[in-house]
Amino acid sequence: MSRNQRDSGKAAVDAKINGKPQTNGGAKRGPKIPKDNSKKKKAPPSNTTPTTNQTNLDKLVNQLYDKNSKQGMPQKQQRKKLQEYLSAQVQGTDSATSSSSASGLAPNSFSDSSASEESSDDELGDMTSPSSSSSLSASDSDEMSEYTLSSSTPEVPAIAKTSGARAELKRRNKEKEALAADPNNNRAPPAKNKNAAEGPGPASSNPRIQRRVTMAGDLVHTEPVTGETGALHCPLKRKSVASCPLPAKAKSPNPTQPAKAAPESKAAGSAKSKAPVVPRLKEDAKNKPGPSARGVSPAVDIEITSCISLPSTAGLPASGSKSPAAGKISPKPGTSASAKPSTSASAKPSTSKSSAKSSSDKSNDAAASGPTTSAPAKKKEESSKSGDKAKSKDYHKVNSIEEGRRILQWILNPVQPDEFFGSFWEKNACQVQRQTPKYFAELISFEMIDEMLIRHHLEFTTNIDVTTYKDGVRQTLNPEGRAMPPAVWSSYADGCSIRILNPSTYLAGLRQVCSMLQEFFHCLVGANVYLTPPNSQGFAPHYDDIEAFVLQVEGRKRWRLYMPVKPTDMLARHSSGNFDQGELDEPIFDEVLEAGDVLYFPRGTVHQAITEKDQHSLHITLSVYQQQAYANLLENLMPMVLKNAVQQKMALRRGLPLHTWQNLGLAHGGSEGRSRLNLISGIQQMVQKYLLPTEEQIDAAVDQLAKRFQHEALPPTILPEERVRTVFGSRSQTDAQGQCLCDYEITEQTSVRLLRANILRLVAEEGILRLYYYVDNALEYCKYDANFMEIEPTEAAAVEMLLHSYPAYIKVGQLPLHSGDRRVDVATALWERGLLMTEKPFK
């Protein structure tokens, strides 16, 4: 159609008849006509009469629908409607032309055609409707707007009002420009025409988008989906429960049927009390032995909301109560604990079925569910509510070492820590059966693992291992690259065990438990998570170099413990290789852990675990006291002692006697000559005389072990009560002149204390005093170099006072420094590094 046409609208119909087809659309059956994208020639203006228009219109209709061909009712209806539509289009064009000519504007005309109902989906995606060109100025583009009708209805949309034709053209051009600018070629559905006939709206004008949506369905967008609560959900569609690789949620998470190979005791299997869901305790509740009372720091992994809920002190036994016997602890009410625990390191753990004292099943569950809700308890709770609120405000005054002890007490409940260290620590295995399936449920779950895999970048081998143990062969089947959920769950469905090596990096609740326990043990507390499918075993029998606490979270798992193969393996300093079953004697412990149970065994204990036929297993292994033996201390101490003795004693610098080589050595080991005996005796006396470590040397060696802890430790979890008192809650601003305005000011009247009991260590190295601290450590193990700051020798006394006065607050003016300005400077430097906490918030 000519771009510069200014005649009446009659020429528009003439151009439709004489001009080239604009698109490859149309309802006529037959081979497709390829779309001609070449520039169209200008048609000369022509003057026609209305009669000629009607004749040409009939020709066009007959061309589209051949009268001689056999036509069904749908084709006849479409032909009739198309004829009516084109007739109305001609009339509308005539009126638009006369109106536009009077105003000096060029008319706009649009035409559409419907697609055949029998067209295929691929043809529908590629079809575009023929449209007449608009009479625009020479500077406008001649690109045509495409409009695809829905194949679900034979009706033709009503004609748009002529007065809004130009606005409609502008809107469509904007849509095309936006579509071209979108790199993903995604567009919103076109706005519904108010004048169009009711029915399904038009299909997408981009056939590629239409095909993509048809093929991909709901999985076009695969990024994590955020729910109403803000938590991410896996976008993958899980299979049905019958075929899903994840185990189905059982009605009872803690089946109490005894294991066939390891029958349970009456104490363990008779009481089947219902375990209440662990409630979340209020943040202001004080003296709760766990992170729920303290809360999770908003600044540390705020995206993961896996904070645990730990019990109140009312649910834990008194410090003077008796502990159950060694080997197995089952807190069944109404039984006595008269049996004495075995303390022999080589003796087999006692299998007596003794249990802890308890008044009822409800009191047994108190450690997991918090205070009971009986009427007397409610009265007592209401009466002490005001007192609890007052105490919660002073929670920042607690001792971090005692808080770590309370976490250990929560894990071992009803066993008291003192009894545990006296009877079991490094001596014997200890099993706690509490029949509370939800006891550790908030630490880890399938949902947390799935969310962790989606949200974070975990790598196989670095963060996750896929293992199997079949027919005596242990294999690690780690793929390369990132551990995405489909790959992990596919391996799990194939019967492989999944080991997560550093879950505390990603789960705030588990990290909080580890960070609090490390204050008590003064060593790195590691955590591994093991997910094992039913009737599977992931690891061969072996022993480790750590004190292990196994926390059964879900399912059941049968554990077998064996005596060390060699006496030198007891309290091993390094982990072993894999043992064959034939190398092991009969197990000294063969029991099934159920959800909520705990098993402790010392380092060097050979162990293996397997799931039952119809039960999966999810458990956490907390590892403590790795490389914390006297041997590690002496490895640091004796080189230091020898170096100092050589510098001080000339006798150690003298040369060896000439006859040493003829009397000492492997070849002379059987000799008992006098020269040999004199040489051996002289060396032994020299060691006893010159290589006795001094107090200062022992202190320096211990500082080196403590320095290693500062490098390995997890960063502390900053609680809300602590945040407002530390640099982590500080915010700075600028004034009108651009000067920085801090919201804190430490004076000599400010009361301060250390953030944690073991937050820093004063170490003398190469004649320099350094403060090593772990507050800035990464969540990954030793990702960065150790953090330290150097201080002057005159400032060491101030650090010592802060260490000795903990957990009490002291005024900055009390620090033993020569001037008030120096005291303020030292306190400010420590506070700005996150090592100090003020008694009162600055805000």
UniProtKB/Swiss-Prot annotation:
Single biological process term from Gene Ontology: negative regulation of DNA-templated transcription
Comp. bias intervals (Basic and acidic residues): 167-179, 378-397
Positions of transmembrane segments: none
A Pfam family this chain is assigned to: JmjC_2
GO (cellular component) term, any one: nucleolus
Location(s) in or outside the cell: Nucleus
Domain JmjC: 502-641
InterPro entries referenced in this protein's UniProt entry, alphabetically: JmjC_dom, NO66-like, RIOX1/NO66-like_C_WH
Keywords: Chromatin regulator, Dioxygenase, Iron, Metal-binding, Nucleus, Oxidoreductase, Phosphoprotein, Repressor, Transcription, Transcription regulation
UniProt enzyme class: oxidoreductase
The keyword Repressor is annotated on this UniProt entry: yes
Cofactor remark from the record: Binds 1 Fe(2+) ion per subunit.
PTM-bearing positions, type Phosphothreonine: T222, T335
EC number(s) recorded for this UniProt protein: 1.14.11.-, 1.14.11.27
Family listed: Belongs to the ROX family. NO66 subfamily.
Protein name: Bifunctional lysine-specific demethylase and histidyl-hydroxylase NO66
